UniProtKB/Swiss-Prot annotation:
Gene expressing this chain: gcvH
Keywords: Lipoyl
This protein's record includes keyword rRNA processing: no
Organism: Coprothermobacter proteolyticus (strain ATCC 35245 / DSM 5265 / OCM 4 / BT)
Cofactor binding: number and manner: Binds 1 lipoyl cofactor covalently.
Official protein name in the record: Glycine cleavage system H protein
Length: 127
C-alpha cells in the first residue's frame, strides 16, 4: 500500500493535504480504495456545504460495496472534484493525486494535530 509522506491521515482512511489560505484537500487512502475495489459511483458534497469532523463528506459505491467518506476536518467545502462524476475510477488509479474528493476551508486548524502522520498511519494499517 502506498502511504505518502507530508499528508495527514484519519482512522477512517482519509488523507488531508494542507494547501494555502487555510484550505486542505481531502481524499481516501490507497488502503481504502484497495479495500473498496473498483469504484463505480461517487456522490460529492455541495460546494458551500458546512461540514464537521466525522460527518459524511461523500459516498462511494464500488462493485463490492458502498461506503461513506467521513470528513477528517471541519469547515466549508469550497471545491469538489467534478471529474469524479464521470470517471469515479480515478480514485482507484490515483487516490492521492487526481482522485482527490474535495477542498475544504478549515474553520479550526488545530484539528490537523489530531490526525496521524504517514508513519503513524502505516503502523495503524499494519504496514
Amino acid at each position: 500500500m502506498k502511504v505518502l509522506e507530508g499528508l495527514k491521515y484519519s482512522k477512517e482512511h482519509e488523507w488531508v493535504k494542507v494547501l494555502e489560505d487555510n484550505k486542505v484537500s481531502v481524499g481516501i487512502t490507497d488502503f481504502a480504495q484497495d479495500e473498496l475495489g473498483d469504484i463505480v459511483f461517487v456522490n460529492l458534497p455541495a460546494v458551500g456545504q458546512e461540514i464537521k469532523v466525522g460527518e459524511t463528506l461523500a459516498s462511494l459505491e464500488s462493485v463490492k460495496s458502498a461506503s461513506d467518506v467521513y470528513s477528517p476536518v471541519s469547515g466549508k467545502v469550497v471545491e469538489v472534484n467534478e471529474k469524479l462524476k464521470n470517471s469515479p475510477e480515478i480514485i482507484n488509479d490515483d487516490p492521492y493525486g487526481e482522485g482527490w474528493i474535495a477542498v475544504i476551508e478549515l474553520s479550526d486548524v488545530s484539528v490537523l494535530d489530531t490526525l496521524m502522520s504517514a508513519e503513524e498511519y502505516k503502523q495503524f494499517i499494519g504496514e
